[in-house]
């Protein structure tokens, strides 16, 4: 295959000229030929995005474009970006191209797969109604997860998306004997480092493959790293395994597309996002699915810009998910963690035919009580509690207890809180909230419910408070 030469370089977008009859295909990987690349990154990879005609292709650089200049030689690989898959990736940290970044030697993988694959066909899909217990009360009660489902953790800056994600990894990945893939998309390097050490200390590192394209990396890396992680997860699924796939953060995937969209010559759409936002999200999300061979249970953190859930990026993500866990700044301000909003969060699994009649009625009872409290808040603020009817006073008292009982100490936050983390089985969660809703805990002070695990702990705490 003949070489091409760089003809234009604007940030991460590079135009490369090839002979007219040797134009590379869309998504083909190109590499910087070694000669003359003393200033630029050795072996820099480009991915073809557009064919401009006359032998010129427009590409995105998957790495820093510092030091590139016109006339540099670029060679074709004849194939899309391919990454190592299989058991050789477990316990390793890789970048967008599947290269190791943990300084632990080369990756021993028998197979490489292209990161661009078709989603499974409709007749291969396998919907699941089996519940996945998380041990986090508010999630198990109000927005239960399905095994093989897709979950989104929505929240603005600093309300606890990553801590919730880490607790879910702690509770599910450690209990779950299967394999996990973690894709760090445009997040802090420190969090990736913490995650690695957390897995190492828990002795589950040999069951996790990690792929990172962090905040400091060029947009090309952040745009493709989610696909790299997904390709590794798909390989395990196709072997008949049940996989956990964690993505932190899906918003940065969208943002990376926005950064290069204008440079690629596309007209921006609403709020400056790329016009292909829905398609890019669909291409990724449709591949994260369970087939008759194996399942992928995906948990994705979604940053909500300016706490606005109607922003095009989170709004586009909503339609692909089975469960949505919405983290609220108002609840975090009350000191209730996890700051999950039980009225905003929802799940397709919360159906009496799936979770059972008792679970459904308790969850709806909890939401009803909290909704009544929300409606009465303005009246209480203006007139005070004394003006309420006895029924409303009782509803408010129970709602405040429910609100506090929805809090829970996390294992991953032990170092900050000083209190040991609690894993609460689903049956205990239902029993506890049922007792509060039915009035069996009316005599207990509301402080007794704050930061405890089961309802029995609340009774013990109440005795100490008296």
Swiss-Prot record:
EC number: 7.1.2.2
Matches recorded under InterPro entries: AAA+_ATPase, ATP-synt_VA_C, ATP_synth_F1_bsu, ATPase_a/bsu_AS, ATPase_alpha/beta_chains, ATPase_F1/V1/A1_a/bsu_N, ATPase_F1/V1/A1_a/bsu_N_sf, ATPase_F1/V1/A1_a/bsu_nucl-bd
Keyword Transport on entry: yes
Gene Ontology cellular component terms for the protein in this record: plasma membrane; proton-transporting ATP synthase complex
UniProt cross-references to Gene3D superfamilies, sorted A to Z: 2.40.10.170, Bovine Mitochondrial F1-atpase, Atp Synthase Beta Chain, Chain D, domain 3, P-loop containing nucleotide triphosphate hydrolases
Coiled coil location: none
UniProt GO molecular function: ATP binding; ATP hydrolysis activity; proton-transporting ATP synthase activity, rotational mechanism
Enzyme's top EC category: translocase
Cited CDD domains: ATP-synt_F1_beta_C, ATP-synt_F1_beta_N, F1-ATPase_beta_CD
Catalytic activity: ATP + H2O + 4 H(+)(in) = ADP + phosphate + 5 H(+)(out)
Binding site for ATP: 155-162
Highest rank taxon of the organism: Bacteria
Family per similarity comment: Belongs to the ATPase alpha/beta chains family.
Function: Produces ATP from ADP in the presence of a proton gradient across the membrane. The catalytic sites are hosted primarily by the beta subunits.
Record note on quaternary structure: F-type ATPases have 2 components, CF(1) - the catalytic core - and CF(0) - the membrane proton channel. CF(1) has five subunits: alpha(3), beta(3), gamma(1), delta(1), epsilon(1). CF(0) has three main subunits: a(1), b(2) and c(9-12). The alpha and beta chains form an alternating ring which encloses part of the gamma chain. CF(1) is attached to CF(0) by a central stalk formed by the gamma and epsilon chains, while a peripheral stalk is formed by the delta and b chains.
Listed name of the protein: ATP synthase subunit beta
């Amino acid at each position: 295959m003949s070489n091409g030469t760089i003809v234009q370089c604007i940030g991460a977008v590079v135009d490369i000229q090839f002979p007219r009859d040797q134009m590379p295909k869309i998504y083909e990987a190109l590499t910087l030929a070694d000669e003359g690349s003393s200033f630029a990154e050795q072996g820099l990879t480009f991915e073809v995005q557009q064919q401009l005609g006359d032998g010129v292709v427009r590409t995105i650089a998957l790495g820093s474009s510092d030091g590139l200049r016109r006339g540099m030689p670029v060679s074709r690989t004849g194939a899309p970006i391919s990454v190592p898959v299989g058991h050789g990736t477990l316990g390793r940290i890789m970048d967008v191209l599947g290269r190791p970044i943990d300084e632990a030697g080369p990756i021993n993988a028998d197979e490489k797969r292209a990161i661009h694959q078709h989603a499974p066909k409709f007749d291969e899909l396998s919907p699941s109604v089996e519940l996945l217990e998380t041990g986090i009360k508010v999630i198990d009660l109000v927005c239960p997860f399905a095994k093989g489902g897709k979950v989104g953790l929505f929240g603005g800056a600093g309300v606890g998306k990553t801590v919730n994600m880490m607790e879910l990894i702690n509770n599910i990945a450690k209990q779950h004997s299967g394999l996990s893939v973690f894709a760090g998309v445009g997040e802090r390097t420190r969090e990736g480092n913490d995650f690695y050490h957390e897995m190492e200390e828990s002795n589950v590192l040999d069951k996790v493959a990690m792929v990172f394209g962090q905040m400091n990396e060029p947009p090309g890396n952040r745009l493709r790293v989610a696909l790299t992680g997904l390709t590794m997860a798909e390989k395990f699924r196709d072997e008949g395994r049940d996989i956990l796939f964690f993505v932190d953060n899906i918003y940065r995937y969208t943002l990376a597309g926005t950064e290069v969209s204008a440079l690629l010559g596309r007209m921006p759409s609403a709020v400056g996002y790329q016009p292909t936002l829905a398609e890019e999200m669909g291409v990724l999300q449709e591949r994260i699915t369970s087939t008759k061979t194996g399942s992928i249970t995906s948990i994705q953190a979604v940053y909500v810009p300016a706490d606005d859930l109607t922003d095009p990026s989170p709004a586009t993500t909503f339609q692909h998910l089975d469960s949505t866990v919405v983290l609220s700044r108002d609840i975090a301000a009350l000191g209730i963690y996890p700051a999950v909003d039980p009225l905003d969060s929802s799940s397709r699994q919360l159906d009496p035919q799936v979770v059972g009649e008792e679970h459904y009625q308790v969850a709806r009872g909890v939401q009803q009580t909290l909704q009544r409290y929300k409606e009465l808040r303005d009246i209480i603020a203006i007139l005070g509690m004394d003006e309420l009817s006895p029924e409303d006073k009782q509803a408010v008292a129970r709602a405040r207890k429910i609100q506090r009982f929805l809090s829970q100490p996390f294992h991953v936050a032990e170092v900050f809180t000083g209190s040991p983390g609690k894993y609460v089985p689903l049956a205990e969660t239902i029993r506890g909230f049922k007792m509060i809703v039915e009035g069996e805990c009316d005599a207990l002070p509301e402080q007794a419910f704050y930061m405890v695990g089961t309802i029995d702990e609340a009774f013990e705490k109440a005795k100490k408070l008296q």
